Amino acid sequence: MKKKLLATVLTLALSLTIVQPSTIYAADNEKVTQAIATAEEKSFDTDYSVTWSDEVEECWSKITLNEQGIVKVNMTKPENKTLGEIDLNLNIYNENKKCIYYFTDSRDLIDATVNVGLDKGTYYIEFNPNYSYANGKTTNYKFSFTPNNDCEIEGNGTRDTATAMKTDHDYTGYMGCNAGSLSDYKDAADVYAVTLKKGQIYKYSFKPETGTTIAKLYGNKVKFGTLWPSYDKDEFCVGPDTVFVAPYTGVYYAYIYNYLGDQYKYKVSVNNVTPKKPALKSVKAGNKSATVHWVKTKGAGYQVQYSLNSNFKDAKTMNVSSTKDTAKIKKLSSNKKYYVRVRSYAKYNTEKSNNIYKYSSWSNVKSAKIK
């Protein structure tokens, strides 16, 4: 009860500190509209530069993507004797002149680097010094692009703008701290929408390189920022590395929010681990041992069962990691014929019970006479 109360308090606190990303709006500034209209088309992997002055306070570029992928922007920060390296702000507008992304590189480094996942299309990238002490200083910059069909698509900070996610795919995204920013378009959260089937077993995975992050998988009725875990369909909320049974067929949302730290790369996925019957490939006899090979399938792990009887009476069982497709059985009796089979399994939790096992059917049976 104390844990649930604590989680409730944290959720309320986060609801006050987490700024829910705003819907993107068309450029309402005539200056921005004119800048977009005159932005110069830039090529990837080409060096460019801009010298800041009272007349040049912003740098605008137009880029065109023929496919989905990750755009990387490298910029050298202007240096001031008093302030040191001056932070750079970056905004991205889509072809409809809507701002979809804002980020400030506030690292105490000479270079500013921003990575962002974008869909195919035309974009306008604007960056500028965070302070007005950069006159006469030059910023060198370059755009690069890596095609990636399994990446975030900004802006994806709400349910309505969530990046579509397929099960059993690792998605790449970038998240960074925007604490204190008043921009409506800051990268406050990344949201992915994935469709799951009731009764199937899944594992939610999130692997950040670094950073202080809230990463949850929510049902379609749960408020973002909720922390208390639940497997109920109306309150569904689980954290990374959770294996669960989907309580309904429909859309679920992977929600990622970073409230501290520099921009970092992460991987997120929802994998179907419902056990499926594996195929046993071979059983090779060794010296008082046998090496078993099978075809990998879905599941959190495998069980290899062996016996001196074809009906598997008095059988022994060994557990094997889901990453393996082979196992060595030791301490067998010489000149004896052993029968072997394998199955996959998944271990999951529910609202009422933990560590529930679900098994697939047993594979075909093979035998070998031990040396």
Segments from the language model and where they lie:
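Beta-strand-rich modules
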Residues: 332-350
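Sec-dependent N-terminal signal peptides of Gram-positive bacterial secreted proteins and lipoproteins
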Residues: 2-24
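Short, flexible loop/turn segments at beta-strand junctions in immunoglobulin-like
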Residues: 115-118, 196, 244-246, 329-333
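Short S/T/G- and acidic-enriched coil/turn segments that sit immediately N-terminal to beta-strands
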Residues: 323-327
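Non-catalytic extracellular/lumenal accessory regions of secreted precursors
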Residues: 23-70, 79-81, 106-108, 144-193, ...
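Pro/Thr/Ser/Gly-rich low-complexity, intrinsically disordered linker/stalk tracts
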Residues: 273-298, 351-371
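C-terminal edge strands of extracellular/lumenal beta-sandwich accessory domains
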Residues: 27-42, 61, 92-95, 122-166, ...
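Extracellular low-complexity, O-glycosylation-prone stalks/linkers
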Residues: 299-318
